[in-house]
């Protein structure tokens, strides 16, 4: 063969994926080809199906296990895949009785054509007597849905919650039936009853034990010797939890209690046989109650895990301590010291009472005569953890013997003798020995009184009572059931005295549960109601104690209590943690922020948190959306800088309101708000205000503002006084220049308005604009000074005159001299004049973006040597921000206005004499080279005829529209 040339030494060893032993995993593919199957047949025939490691050497990527499974399950010609015969099933049952249900390879040798896997599946899915082959009940389906929500498709795990159902049967029933009924169960609300119930897993061995007992009962109702010995050996090894239900005993009856004997009179056994549809009423003298001891720090009954009831031939039910997996070994050892087995002659019920706290986990009965156990109540045993809530034990359990004669003769009295009772004042101390217990003996009393039957209802079965609810009856029990078995008729329950007699101040809520009518039908479903939402902790046996006792450091979880439900959650008081500082800054620092000022010496802020400092500023949270309460330290700095911004911005804001100021003056005939006027200031600091009609008003600035200005605009006075001081300094400088016989270069700046006529109205026409002025126009640093000041040529005006332009956008004059309304608003030609200085430096915006600056520097409107200081005065307008497109649009509009206005003035007023040209050359030489380089457009060598002044200016000013 070709495959024989391939040896293991020639192969490359594969990784073992974490395994340290076993064959190397050389393949993960599961598809076998036809060639591989043929090679496997020949190899098996060559080695006679014995040496599978040698057989695996014929394949490069196959292990010996894969080859074995492929041969046994698929390729073996002797393999039988058909249905099982009756003879094969009988052989499997006999072999399992001989070898046990684990040696499947040995069992398969006696069944030709069958492998161990087939035998195992046949037993667990069909032949096992513990399998429940009946139709699925509604409770089982609801329990399956509940368990499937937790474990999913782990069918082997689901078998622990559904005794008698195999994993294969559960899987088939889920996909065939339950999965389709899921929506109907959800809508009907039946599934909600199982949501609050925790799942209690079952031991398969317990079901097998009950089934094994059933199968080994002989005709006389007795166990054979082999079955009895096997049961004894099992119970000696471990106490197995068992849940008894009607379905476990469908094909026969099992004797329970003291009437069940390994051998005895069959007639007596038949009279006391337990059937699935009969009820069981125990007598008080035959009741054996085993109560687990609970330590002082385990008062919370919710800490106990699930537990079951176990059966044994010792004539009682026992509490399974082995299932308390979460309890320490010492605790379990103390529990094991409780005497569990009781015989029929035992008339006592032992109650473990450590630390004055009783925790009744399971009440078990040894008498099988009269236990009231309908089939619908079988599920109560399936969820014993719901019954493990706290119960208050009646004072009647510890009543003195001399109190017996004072009680109604019909009431069953449980009292403890003075010699046996160990509950005293010392039991109030938590240091009492955990092994302390007292014995409650049944009352013997008068001869005519015998203990009445007792129905012990756990706290789970009552919604309003937290005590151990006892319903005593007459000597002859008068409990009857109706036809369908859904109600229990209680005879004369008015004599019952129960529920927390240990305190004189029992609440009405606890007493409202008792039935005062002579007869009343009590639904059985009331006993199956859900547990209360809140767990009950057991009260201590202390006098006058009515409220639940809560201890610190018990580990019991308690919900956060608020002062009032009417108040919002943010009004609560949260005390400061003492140990861990990070608890003060629990989620988003709420604990610190919500701390009341009454309990906190100083207000605490969110950014004091160790983690909040790093994440609060940059993270998005609901706290950042609050207005003023939770501001970061950055906002405090902004509030300080806002004062500087307001001072720097006062000039630009004040002059934009001058027209409003003059409109409110008493002399409304001057009509300052409807025309363009000029204020001339002379050396004596008098202001001459010229309106459009040529009228003039003069006076001191102080008299102007004090006489004309309303009170709400008096804050502009200081701003105008600053302007007055600036004008005086400019006059002094011009005077010095005139004494040196150097012609001063006039500085002009005007406000450009666009009117309906389409032509600009210049406040001071006839002025010449030099190249230095054009350069200064394009410099953002000097815009405020040029806006507030304008010096006129000393040939036309006084050398010391300074004019301030006041512009009103409402009305303007056309060519004919008539006043015309202007619908468009006045528009400043510079964005630097109309916005406050240094506003928004600390806030991120598109103006400070490096992309904006990089795109602005090589712009044709700005030279490449523009410094950062010049860029510092480019800000966003107040109360708004621009995007990148809006920024460039705003700059282009205003710089176009600069260029158009400067070019129009130069072309319209172009001197032709030699003196003017010499003056231009002198200006060019004396100008700062830095300013000269900042011009927008240079028309130095361009001249136009004077007659075309209007046409040229109109052409150049098209960009302003």
UniProtKB/Swiss-Prot annotation:
Disruption phenotype: In EDC plants, defects of cytokinesis. The double mutant myb3r1 myb3r4 often fails to complete cytokinesis, resulting in multinucleate cells with gapped walls and cell wall stubs in diverse tissues (e.g. in embryo during the first or second division after fertilization, in stomata guard mother cell) and several pleiotropic developmental defects, and associated with the selective reduction of several G2/M phase-specific genes transcript levels (e.g. CYCB2, CDC20.1 and KNOLLE). Hypersensitivity to caffeine, an inhibitor of cytokinesis. Impaired powdery mildew (e.g. Keywords: Activator, DNA-binding, Nucleus, Repeat, Transcription, Transcription regulation. Gene3D superfamilies: Homeodomain-like. Its main location: nucleus. One of its GO terms (biological process) is defense response to fungus. Residues 24-75, 76-131, 132-182 form the HTH myb-type domain. A motif (Nuclear localization signal) lies at residues 612-619. The keyword Cell cycle does not apply. Residues 534-554 have a biased composition (Basic and acidic residues). The keyword Transcription regulation applies. Residues 52-75, 104-127, 155-178 bind DNA. Residues 391-405, 416-430, 764-781 have a biased composition (Polar residues). SUPFAM superfamilies: Homeodomain-like (SSF46689). It is found in: Nucleus. Pfam families: Myb_DNA-binding (PF00249). Expressed in roots, cotyledons and leaves, especially in vascular tissues, and in flowers. Residues 1-33, 390-457, 534-555, 756-781 are annotated as: Disordered. PANTHER family: MYB PROTEIN-RELATED. Transcription factor that binds 5'-AACGG-3' motifs in gene promoters. Involved in the regulation of cytokinesis, probably via the activation of several G2/M phase-specific genes transcription (e.g. KNOLLE). Required for the maintenance of diploidy. Component of a DREAM-like complex which modulates a variety of developmentally regulated genes and of the mitotic genes in proliferating and differentiated cells. Associates with CDKA-1, RBR1 and E2FB, but not with E2FC, in proliferating cells, at early stages of leaves development. This is Transcription factor MYB3R-4. It comes from Arabidopsis thaliana. The gene is MYB3R4.
């Amino acid at each position: 063969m070709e495959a024989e040339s391939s040896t293991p030494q020639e192969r490359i060893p594969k990784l073992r994926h974490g395994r340290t032993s076993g064959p190397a995993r050389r393949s993960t593919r599961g598809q076998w080809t036809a060639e591989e199957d043929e090679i496997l047949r020949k190899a098996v025939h060559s080695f006679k199906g014995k040496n599978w490691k040698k057989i695996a050497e014929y394949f490069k990527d196959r292990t010996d296990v894969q080859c074995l499974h492929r041969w046994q399950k698929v390729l073996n010609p002797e393999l039988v895949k058909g249905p099982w015969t009756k003879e094969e099933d009988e052989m499997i049952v006999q072999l399992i009785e001989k070898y046990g249900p684990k040696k499947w390879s040995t069992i398969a040798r006696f069944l030709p054509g069958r492998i161990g896997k087939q035998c195992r599946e046949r037993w667990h899915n069909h032949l096992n007597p513990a399998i429940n082959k009946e139709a699925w009940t509604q409770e089982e389906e609801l329990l399956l849905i509940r368990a499937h929500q937790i474990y999913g498709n782990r069918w082997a795990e689901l078998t622990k919650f559904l005794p008698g159902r195999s994993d294969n049967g559960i899987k088939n029933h889920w996909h065939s039936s339950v999965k389709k009924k899921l929506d109907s169960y959800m809508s009907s609300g039946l599934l909600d009853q199982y949501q609050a119930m925790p799942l209690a897993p079952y031991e398969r061995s317990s079901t097998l034990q009950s089934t094994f007992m059933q199968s080994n009962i002989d005709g006389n109702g007795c166990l054979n010797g082999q079955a009895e010995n096997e049961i004894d050996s099992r119970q000696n090894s471990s106490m197995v939890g068992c849940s008894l239900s009607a379905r476990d005993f469908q094909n026969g009856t099992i004797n329970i209690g003291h009437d069940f004997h390994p051998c005895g009179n069959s007639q007596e056994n038949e009279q006391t046989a337990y059937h699935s549809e009969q009820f069981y009423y125990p007598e008080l003298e035959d009741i054996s109650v085993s109560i687990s001891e609970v330590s002082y720090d385990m008062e919370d009954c919710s800490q106990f895990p699930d537990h079951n009831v176990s059966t044994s031939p010792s004539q009682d039910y026992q509490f399974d301590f082995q299932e308390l997996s979460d309890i320490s070994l010492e605790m379990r050892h103390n529990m094991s010291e409780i005497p569990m087995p009781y015989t029929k002659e035992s008339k006592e019920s032992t109650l473990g009472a450590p630390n004055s706290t009783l925790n009744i986990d399971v009440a078990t009965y040894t008498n099988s005569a009269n236990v009231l156990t309908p089939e619908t109540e079988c599920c109560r045993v399936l969820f014993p953890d719901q019954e493990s809530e706290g119960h208050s034990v009646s004072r009647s359990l510890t009543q003195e013997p001399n109190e017996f004669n004072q009680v109604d003769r019909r009431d069953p009295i449980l009292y403890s003798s003075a010699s046996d009772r160990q509950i005293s004042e010392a039991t109030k101390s938590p240091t009492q020995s955990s092994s302390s217990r007292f014995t409650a003996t049944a009352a013997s009393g008068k001869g005519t009184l015998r203990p009445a039957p007792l129905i012990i209802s756990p706290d789970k079965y009552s919604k309003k009572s937290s005590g151990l609810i006892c319903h005593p009856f007459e000597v002859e029990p008068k409990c009857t059931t109706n036809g369908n078995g859904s109600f229990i008729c209680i005879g004369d329950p008015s004599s019952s005295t129960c529920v927390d007699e240990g305190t004189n101040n029992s609440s009405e809520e606890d007493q409202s549960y008792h039935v005062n009518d002579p007869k009343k039908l009590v639904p059985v479903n009331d006993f199956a109601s859900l547990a209360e939402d809140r767990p009950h902790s057991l009260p201590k046996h202390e006098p006058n104690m009515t409220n639940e006792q809560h201890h610190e450091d018990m580990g019991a979880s308690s919900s956060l209590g608020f002062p009032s439900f009417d108040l919002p959650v943010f009004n609560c008081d949260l005390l400061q943690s003492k140990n861990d500082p990070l608890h003060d800054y629990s989620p988003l620092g709420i604990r610190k922020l919500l701390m009341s000022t009454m309990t906190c010496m100083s207000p605490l802020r969110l950014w004091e948190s160790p983690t909040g400092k790093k994440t609060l500023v940059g993270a998005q949270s609901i706290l950042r959306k609050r207005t003023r309460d939770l501001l970061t330290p950055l906002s405090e700095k902004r509030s300080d800088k806002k004062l500087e911004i307001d001072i720097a911005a006062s000039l630009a804001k004040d002059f934009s309101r001058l027209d409003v100021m003059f409109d409110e003056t008493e002399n409304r005939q001057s009509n300052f708000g409807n025309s363009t006027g000029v204020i001339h200031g002379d050396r004596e600091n008098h202001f001459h205000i010229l309106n459009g009609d040529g009228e003039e008003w003069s006076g001191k600035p102080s008299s102007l503002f004090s006489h004309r200005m309303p009170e709400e605009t008096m804050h502009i006075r200081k701003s105008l006084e600053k302007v007055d001081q600036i004008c005086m300094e400019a006059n002094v400088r011009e005077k010095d220049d005139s004494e040196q016989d150097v012609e001063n270069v006039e500085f002009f700046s005007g406000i450009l308005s666009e009117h309906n006529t389409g032509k600009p109205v210049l406040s001071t026409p006839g002025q010449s604009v030099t190249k230095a002025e054009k350069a200064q126009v394009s410099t953002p640093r000097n815009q405020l000074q040029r806006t507030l000041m304008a010096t006129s040529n000393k040939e036309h005006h006084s050398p010391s005159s300074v004019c301030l332009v006041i512009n009103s956008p409402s009305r303007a004059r056309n060519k004919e001299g008539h006043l015309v309304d202007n619908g468009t608003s006045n528009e400043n030609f510079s964005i630097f004049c109309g916005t406050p200085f240094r506003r928004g430096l600390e806030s991120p915006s598109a103006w400070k973006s490096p992309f904006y600056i990089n795109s602005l520097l090589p712009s044709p409107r700005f030279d490449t040597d523009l410094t950062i200081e010049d860029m510092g005065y480019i800000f966003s307008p107040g109360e708004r921000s621009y995007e990148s497109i809006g920024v460039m649009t705003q700059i282009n509009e205003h710089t176009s206005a600069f260029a158009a206005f400067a070019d129009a003035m130069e072309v319209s007023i172009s001197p032709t004499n030699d003196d003017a040209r010499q003056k231009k050359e002198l200006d060019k030489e004396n100008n700062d080279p830095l300013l000269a380089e900042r011009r927008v457009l240079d028309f130095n060598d361009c001249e136009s005829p004077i007659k075309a002044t209007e046409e040229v200016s109109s052409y150049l000013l098209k960009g302003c529209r």
